[in-house]
């Protein structure tokens, strides 16, 4: 078992009282699983991701990664935010290396490997202002994976990109997953993206956020968004939103 999320609940304190954001979240991921999490705005998807990342310790329950209870960020977790968060004064290769020295041959070789994997050959010496948003997000992906984390956590990383760039980065991410078999938890609002990428879809309800349904996705890769089997699964997911009373708050 790579990741185990056990009975996780989360509360926020407000002037009007205590608000429960997450209620009794339980699910497990084996090594190499690709799980997408979808649900209405405000259902706690991003909050759950931050808890798994060790960025939020004020919760009930526990997160176990590779047999170790998580209480803070570590090399076990890679995190990709909605925005790339690159350092503008560092080049592409320096951003990927982050706090590691490119003078170290092992680090330099690893950076070179990831530059090739995310298809940024020739842009190693470029600065963030000199590359596109999609390229910047590829740098963020490479940076998060450089240390070979046990799980990669992605918080709507392609949400702000145009459709063409988003589609391209989906292919880049799938290529990485197929090569490295990194365990991934990917938060998205896009049902098609959830179906296209993952082998399991976790649907959350809101107020408080809890798991409404987990759907296994057994479509073979590469997936065709216009195929009958893809559309049938899309209908199945949409029906869960409708039957669960989620669709009114998800639009």
Swiss-Prot record:
Topological category with respect to the lipid bilayer: Peripheral membrane protein
EC number in record: 7.6.2.14
CDD domains in UniProt: ABC_NrtD_SsuB_transporters
Catalytic activity: ATP + H2O + aliphatic sulfonate-[sulfonate-binding protein]Side 1 = ADP + phosphate + aliphatic sulfonateSide 2 + [sulfonate-binding protein]Side 1
Residues holding ATP: 39-46
Pfam families recorded: ABC_tran
Predominant localisation class: membrane
Record flagged with keyword Signal: no
Superkingdom as given in the UniProt entry: Bacteria
Gene Ontology CC: plasma membrane
Compartment(s) of residence: Cell membrane
ABC transporter domain mapped to chain residues: 3-231
GO MF, one annotated term: ATP binding
InterPro entries: AAA+_ATPase (IPR003593), ABC_transporter-like_ATP-bd (IPR003439), ABC_transporter-like_CS (IPR017871), ABC_transporter_ATP-bind (IPR050166), P-loop_NTPase (IPR027417)
Keywords: ATP-binding, Cell membrane, Membrane, Nucleotide-binding, Translocase, Transport
Quaternary organization: The complex is composed of two ATP-binding proteins (SsuB), two transmembrane proteins (SsuC) and a solute-binding protein (SsuA).
Family stated for the protein in its record: Belongs to the ABC transporter superfamily. Aliphatic sulfonates importer (TC 3.A.1.17.2) family.
Biological role stated in the UniProt entry: Part of the ABC transporter complex SsuABC involved in aliphatic sulfonates import. Responsible for energy coupling to the transport system.
Name of the protein: Aliphatic sulfonates import ATP-binding protein SsuB
Organism: Bacillus thuringiensis subsp. konkukian (strain 97-27)
Gene responsible for this protein: ssuB
